[in-house]
Design a protein with these regions (language model features):
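Alpha-helix capping/hinge segments and adjacent helical runs
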Residues: 133-145, 170, 174-178
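C-terminal substrate-recognition/cap domain of FAD-linked oxidoreductases
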Residues: 1-120, 124, 131, 135
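Short amphipathic alpha-helical segments
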Residues: 119, 123-127, 140, 148, ...
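Gly/Ser/Thr-rich beta-alpha loop segments that engage phosphate groups in nucleotides
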Residues: 98-103, 139, 146-148, 183
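Short proline/glycine- and acidic-rich turn/helix-capping motifs at secondary-structure junctions
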Residues: 26-40, 140-155
Length: 185
């Protein structure tokens, strides 16, 4: 017969634990537990943000990146090193879907500066994306490319991936009628 989904999840988590990929896990048994876990996630980011506001770190560069799970720790060390060399007072908060490598990687800058990053926010973002690329990640994960990131597409995607995206877009929408005026290529 079929194995219930909870048993499948337990088996996967047990294997991850045995391989030292995780140290703990929780499976929600009902909607109240699920809501409780979500509130912890949301409260943690909000709490950290309030602490940063006390130091006037209120400008935020938000990034939606993905990485191979096994690279997250090394990526974060490299990113923190780059960020502290860039502007030592910057701080990061990252959270998200660690199990599949999708991260909301937010960098907070000084609220006294026009953009919070000494006018270097795009340069900082490019440096971060270079580190993402080093670890075979993507500068855009679950939220897609969109208008804000379209200029990063050719720079931060390898040529094969970029070409495949163009081919797929042209095959699915040869007349350019889906999302007109927003074509990325």
């Amino acid at each position: 017969g079929q194995i219930p989904i909870i048993k499948t999840i337990e088996n996967v988590l047990e294997e991850c634990f045995e391989r030292n990929l995780i140290s703990d896990a929780t499976i929600c048994k009902n909607e109240n537990q699920s809501k409780s876990l979500w509130s912890i996630r949301e409260a943690a980011a909000e709490s950290e943000k309030k602490e940063l506001e006390k130091s006037n770190l209120i400008k935020c560069l938000k990034h939606d990146i993905s990485l191979p799970v096994e690279s997250i720790d090394d990526f974060h060390k490299d990113a923190q090193n780059m960020i502290s060399n860039f502007l030592p007072e910057l701080r990061t908060i990252y959270f998200g879907h660690l199990g599949d490598g999708n991260l909301h990687y937010n960098i907070f800058g000084n609220g006294s500066l026009p953009d919070g990053f000494k006018g270097e926010s795009q340069n900082l973002t490019n440096k971060l994306y270079e580190i993402v690329h080093k670890y075979n990640g993507s500068f855009s994960a679950e939220h897609g490319i969109g208008q804000l990131k379209k200029n990063n597409l050719k720079t931060h995607k390898n040529n094969v991936a970029y070409s495949l995206m163009k081919i797929i877009k042209n095959q699915l929408d040869p007349k350019g009628i889906m999302n007109p005026g927003k074509v990325l290529f």
